[in-house]
């Protein structure tokens, strides 16, 4: 967005859920561009959020902040309430106050939960979340829909599918595996490697978001012919859109791509599937393509190699 002339206000709470220095380095890299302004406070601080938004007057808001992680939500559910529910509520209040042109909010593929139908389509049911994290993101979708209906806030929810790549979260499998393998330590492989994920390279995710900024959900009275399979609400300017590669990769193939990129064969601890996890995620990206003309397409081998190149530079390996 900075490359195309946008002025970007980046807000990060700098929580210690993972390495704060990594977040700080991200902000420092972005601050090299004069179009970027860095802010630091928590989203549950409504007063600071409102003050900052009144000052900067954003016309588009992209809400990517959340307490992430399926497993962590079992042990620390309160942090998910504070960040994902209260924080998102504050975002909605600010969007209402400002009358933004478009509010875009991150959801997750985990909202599909126990849904047996594959690939996951945006109009599939999301009634059975299997983790508290997924439940909070499902609640975000419902909260945003109600505000879109009540206050005519054009809103797009992104459902992300296993994002990976440079600057990724250290609690994600790719980061953890690389760190362990370079240290000569074994890696924990859940569900004995039989997990399947729709791995989505971060660069593709960003491109999908960038294109969706200009695809503003219309008000119910301002619509042309419906798009087949659209998730557009009948009563609100609100829709959900999957951003995923549209293919499933077995965890063992993902690990092999990392082994090839690092030139190391991992020692593997085969483990049972963790509580709250789902065995398969698979995105339908038909709606994304219809709306934007774009679908993620970076092969796992290429994306993992880019991550390894970044990791070696960032951590001097």
Regions of interest found by a model, annotated:
Residues 1-163, 212-213, 280, 294, ...:
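N-terminal Rossmann-like NAD(P)+-binding domain of SDR-like oxidoreductases, especially those catalyzing
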